[in-house]
């Protein structure tokens, strides 16, 4: 099979996907005025000539030498609360801040967000990232959604999170988040995990976590392409690894401050959807894609405040754990659809109906690292969120519950006794 040639390509990842096709990734050359090169993931049909077809040449064309206009990809969360939608528009010149971009609209009746007789939904640009697919000065734009009257849609969870993070009490605490996004790759036409025999199962879990080798690691090229594309886009991605279940991967974003955490997770999910789309692989964030003795998929959220990170911060961590225990049901109800299939008390999870915490215990609701305990300061890990959670909801709730919400003294005392917390 011929290898596709990409002009001035500085890096390449190749995956054999099917006969007559080569999957490759590369960086295009720098454009006019020092415009950033673009990271490309391509499905290239190669015939006897081995020449990149004209369609691919057009897709990879750098327009910066020819025009100041740029393409802005407006991205928003759809009606299900987990689906990602986007559409493109031309902007007259490069932009550096979302305030430079116009509001836009779309047909909300086609996304389950508005009735047909009053279907217009307004997009408010909120954050911009470099576009790793188009390169140059083109941008990806995180938007939230409003009615024409300026009211946030019920699916606009960013609006409430922004209110929480703009509260002076929250701002003083400079909340940090490190989010571990797990996901599963599926074979397109059979909806079965990548690398698994169709209609069958691989060997038991054990050899696959952080593994290498064609018989143990499935989808590394997608994970690597996503990693590099996120770095290019300006996402604060901090790592990636193969997960316990074969065909499942994880990447980490953070530490991020406040609302930035949600923006970075949503844009990273969008980029991952685009890469899997081009690779002909299905991405699922289902928290338990395969029933049985297989790990589910979570979105563990590491969290700290300024007080937790300072000397003596472990006492503040314990106080936060106490508050979280008192609002366990509220958090569980907002931590992702289908999470009851994952939080069973098995496969490194706590039982969904019982709040628990522990040091270095991955079977607890809240885990505290040994390093945090030893230093007397640090962070906590909320292990309850599902892989399909909304990061705006989870980060906002963590800040609200641990900084703004005040339990009654009686409830606090009872919870402290139950959890053996001396606060």
From Swiss-Prot:
Catalytic activity: L-glutamate + NH4(+) + ATP = L-glutamine + ADP + phosphate + H(+)
Residue stretch of the organelle transit peptide: 1-51
One biological process term in Gene Ontology: glutamine biosynthetic process
Compartments reported by the entry: Plastid, Chloroplast
Signal sequence, renumbered to the chain: none
Family named by the database record: Belongs to the glutamine synthetase family.
Subunit structure: Homooctamer.
The name this protein goes by in its record: Glutamine synthetase, chloroplastic
Species the sequence originates in: Zea mays (Maize)
